[in-house]
Design a protein with these regions (language model features):
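Alpha-helix capping/hinge segments and adjacent helical runs
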Residues: 22, 417-429, 454, 458-462
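Activity-critical C-terminal alpha-helical subdomain
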Residues: 181, 434-472
Length: 472
């Protein structure tokens, strides 16, 4: 049975209005249905009892202190672009939107950092850094995601192969705890071995441990030269086999992505975004950044020679911003294109060792096809994060789709584990992957997860039923 959370009353609604403002609070049927779910309604549609837009940490603190006292569950929501059913009110209660907390503070040039509130958009932080001649590298596909959401999911993206994940760029965090207290995790320093590294525990915790109110991010000098290569191959298998060849070169790529021609056709057909390379049944897209043209030219030459020596039909250099933009626009349009081309979608977001990518891709296509599902693997092959996109055709009934996707997921996750991989590389556990987590983690690790949750949130009020589930 569910944990006995309090059903909210008019007195509770009035209190939340008193510490925020009446025009920033909605209750019951007043709440827009878009706040019942994230980008994957398949992972749960749950109406909040109250939706509030907060402006500062003091409002969050007051609400959390009250919710803690009254035993009311609270979920924090950013831009709602998650893909795991994470920012949803599974047990009702309060949904707090931090999207009005979107201030980006001036760059700290001496420390090469930038500080922002959680509702600031990733695209705006990247623009602010660029305006100062600096660079914020984490680059997940959804540029309109909030930075708070990026931090609590440890977002990665296409440039992780060279620059790492969001975690690698977080210097310090300010957050409100479940009891309403306000804490700082670390400070704007490069090194810190002062006690347990709680900051890195908070990063990637999916909003289950605390609510971010401010984050300070490391910046890098902006690269002065960049180039995108497109390597077409006769088959997806040949394309995947090329990945370790690229990684063996003495130049670290900024991004390595693969796309099948069928997926490119979906984007072209539905979004009218044209891919500039027409050859090949699959393509490998490789990007390099460099601080000098000489360094960049050396990297491009080495990659092109390796591609042609390993079966590529060509190695096309997207030498202008327009051609490079066309390549990455198609890559960025995959999710939107698939939504337009199918009745429904399901995704397996596994990560496998880079040396096993080709093996995973070959087996994944067979698994999904055996269950009658159209499947389109793609992803960040530079870090082994493969998005296995499953698309529902109009001929499948709801029950057939549900059974086929579940059976496919069971086998795909088992395949990932067999290859030494993990359940999720980017999107997290949320509500959508709960049933598969214990198989990966094991009972001892699940017990550790629960102990960590209780250490932060002893009343289990913050985003309950995500990552781990006490209410079974």
């Amino acid at each position: 049975m569910a944990y006995p959370y309090k059903k909210m009353t008019s007195e509770d609604f009035d209190y939340i209005r008193s510490v925020t403002a009446s025009d920033r609070v909605w209750v019951g049927d007043e709440i827009a249905k878009e706040y019942y779910r994230d980008e994957m309604p398949e992972y749960g549609v749950f109406p909040p009892e109250l939706y509030a837009e907060v402006l500062n940490k003091e409002e969050i603190s007051a609400i959390m202190a009250y919710a803690y006292k009254e035993n009311i569950p609270v979920v924090c929501r950013g831009a709602g672009t998650g893909l795991a059913g994470g920012a949803t009110c599974k047990y009702g209660g309060i949904m707090l939107s931090v999207m009005r907390m979107n201030k980006i503070f001036p760059i700290d040039r001496k420390n090469q950092t930038i500080t922002a509130e959680p509702g600031a958009l990733l695209i705006d932080i990247q623009a602010a850094a660029a305006a100062g001649g600096l660079f914020y590298p984490p680059d997940p596909g959804e540029k309109t995601a909030s930075i708070g959401g990026n931090v609590i999911t440890n977002a990665g993206g296409m440039k992780a192969v060279r620059y790492g994940l969001t975690r690698d760029f977080v210097r310090c965090i300010e957050a409100v705890m479940p009891d309403g207290s306000i804490m700082n995790f670390s400070s704007n320093v490069v090194k810190n071995t002062t006690g347990y590294d709680v900051k890195d525990l908070v990063i990637g915790s999916e909003g289950t441990l605390c609510i971010l109110t401010q984050v300070t991010l490391k910046l890098l000098p902006a690269p002065t030269c960049t180039c995108t290569l497109v390597m077409p191959f006769r088959s997806l298998e040949e394309c995947a086999d090329m990945v370790p060849k690229v990684l063996e070169l003495p130049f670290v790529p900024t991004a390595i992505e693969f796309l099948e021609r069928e997926l490119i056709d979906i984007v072209e057909r539905n979004l009218n975004k044209m891919f500039p390379v027409k050859q090949g049944e699959a393509v490998l897209i490789v990007m390099y950044d460099a601080s000098s043209k000489q360094e960049l030219d050396s990297a491009v030459e080495a990659a092109a020679e390796a591609a042609l020596a390993n079966g590529a039909l060509d190695c096309c250099i997207a030498g202008t911003p327009e051609r490079a933009g066309a390549v990455w626009s198609v890559r960025g349009g995959i999710l939107e294109g698939m939504k337009a081309d199918s009745v429904a979608q399901e995704e397996c977001d596994v990560v496998v060792p880079r040396a096993r990518i080709a093996e995973y891709v070959k087996a994944a296509k067979k698994i999904a096809s055996a269950h009658g599902i159209r499947v389109e693997p793609c992803g960040h092959c530079g870090d082994g994060n493969i998005h296995t996109e499953m698309l529902r055709g109009p001929e499948m009934s709801d029950q057939e789709w549900k059974e086929a996707t579940h059976a496919s997921l069971v086998e795909l996750y088992a395949l990932s584990k067999e290859l030494g991989g993990q359940l999720s590389g980017e999107h997290g556990i949320g509500n959508g992957r709960l049933e598969f987590l214990e198989e990966f983690a094991g009972p001892r690790m699940i017990a550790l997860y629960k102990a960590i949750k209780l250490a932060f949130d002893d009343k289990l009020i913050l985003n309950p039923g995500k990552v781990i589930e006490y209410n079974k």
